[in-house]
Amino acid sequence: MATVTSAAVAIPSFTGLKAGASSSSRVSTGASAKVAAAPVARLTVKASLKDVGAVVAATAVSAMLASNAMALEVLLGGDDGSLAFIPGNFSVSAGEKITFKNNAGFPHNVVFDEDEIPAGVDASKISMSEEDLLNAAGETYSVTLSEKGTYTFYCAPHQGAGMVGKVTVN
């Protein structure tokens, strides 16, 4: 919340002003201006840098603490137009969110191979439908894997071109 305060200002009174007066006429100011204002905090460069340092340190600590809860981002397609998951082979902790992001605008999806996931995991609950596609650059699909083991996943339209990846859940 911001507050605004005004200062008391005394306006001087001018007497003896006449229109068309000669240059030798004098202007009389019977009162002087007085301003009452709240004291202004004075910052030194040293204090400012100290404050900036504290903000930077606090931001870094927040980022480190939040990084454990952040999602791992996997790009669907390379900047060079390659049909690949980037990274293609990675590890996450159980319960960590994985976000797959369409990088290049080609239609992609993420399907987990039911024959290459841990026993007891239902591939249909963690996969996109083979008919569903992330068509535009920036579109995402997120999944959280809680069972430890190795999971193989692929992009259905580009599996034949080698767009396959692996994640190990620790």
From Swiss-Prot:
Cystine crosslinks: none
Coiled coil location: none
Keyword hit for Metal-binding: yes
Cofactor(s) the protein requires to work: Cu(2+)
Positions of the Plastocyanin-like domain: 72-170
Residues the entry annotates as binding Cu cation: 108, 155, 158, 163
Subcellular location field: Plastid, Chloroplast thylakoid membrane
Protein name: Plastocyanin, chloroplastic
